[in-house]
A protein has these predicted regions:
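Sequence-structural signature of mature extracellular/luminal beta-sheet repeat domains
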Residues: 1-188
Length: 188
């Protein structure tokens, strides 16, 4: 095992609590997600019910050994994938049913935009291939409770205090989408 990051290695002095996915650029830069700066691995249910933007997209430079936050305020930052030409990187926002695009090169470098939104389920991991297709795993269909309670923190707190057996349960169904580099579904 090689340890290249400590929990306190972020440039913003925010601990890395839930490092989730990564992709490595040809120059060695490591792009990765921290799903939640508040909760650690195994606490995704808390993150789901709290529904707050605690996630981040970061990059680690192995030469300078510095970690930089590229995007913060993400709702459970999850899968990460570079485009085939490495001009942008994608990061899933699981709790918002969408994927963000962060530009690395060109006129838009350093900015972000929505790559695709209103996905039919929670996007989990994402990977890309040489043909420019992004394969996105969706681990459950959209959840009515998440949608209804997204702007009702009091309701979410009440539900969190219920025994887990009485809390809303996910539908266990997963599927995969293939997206082109413009965010259009080309395989489902």
């Amino acid at each position: 095992t090689i340890n290249i990051l400590s929990r306190k290695s972020d440039s913003d002095n925010i601990p890395l609590n839930f490092v989730d996915d990564l992709d490595i650029a040809s120059d060695g830069q490591i792009y990765f997600s921290d799903a939640s700066s508040k909760y650690g691995y195994g606490s995704d249910r808390l993150e789901l019910f709290e529904h707050t933007p605690n996630g981040r997209l970061l990059v680690y430079d192995p030469i300078t050994q510095k970690t930089t936050t590229l995007l913060s305020g993400l709702y459970f930052a999850n899968g990460v994938a570079l485009s085939s030409d490495e001009s942008f990187v994608l990061v899933n926002e699981t709790l918002m049913y969408r994927i963000q695009k962060y530009w690395l090169k060109g006129d838009k470098a350093g900015t972000s935009e929505i790559f695709i939104e209103n996905l039919p389920g929670f996007p989990d991991n994402v990977s890309s291939n040489e043909e420019g297709i992004f394969w996105v795993a969706l681990f459950n269909p959209r959840n009515n409770f998440v949608e209804i309670s997204s702007n009702k923190p009091f309701l979410r707190k009440i539900v969190l205090r219920l025994p887990e057996l009485l809390q809303p349960q996910p539908v266990k169904h997963s599927f995969v989408l293939g997206l082109n580099e413009n965010g259009k579904v080309v395989h489902n």
